[in-house]
């Protein structure tokens, strides 16, 4: 199965307070055939997640009101979404940041600025496979 075929129709949520990051990720993902749900911060994401039920979630760490660690922890505590893969997005690449992300339940860590290939590879790693 080709990479594009594997990603076709996969619903991905991008949670980031930067419009530039949200739009860049959206362009890359839509070109690959994904459905994209955008959220400006953790509160916005929590309001949308139940309605849209994304297959993969990307979450920025440094956001106003509810940071990425808090957002991740709340998503992972919800029985319905605890198994949804969540990938932290951050310009910080320290060991402590990665460890803290794991402690709250993140499945992977992607450093910003990300490339189209690294973003799509992360989705492909966690995208549900068709039977």
Question: Model-flagged regions — what are they?
Answer:
Residues 23-31:
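Charged docking surfaces used in two-component/phosphorelay signaling
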Residues 33-40, 48:
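Short hydrophobic/Thr-rich beta-strand motif most characteristic of the beta2 strand and flanking loop
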Residues 52-58:
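Active-site beta3 strand of CheY-like receiver
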Residues 63:
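Receiver (REC) domain active-site loop signature in two-component systems and cognate sites
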Residues 114-124:
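C-terminal output helix
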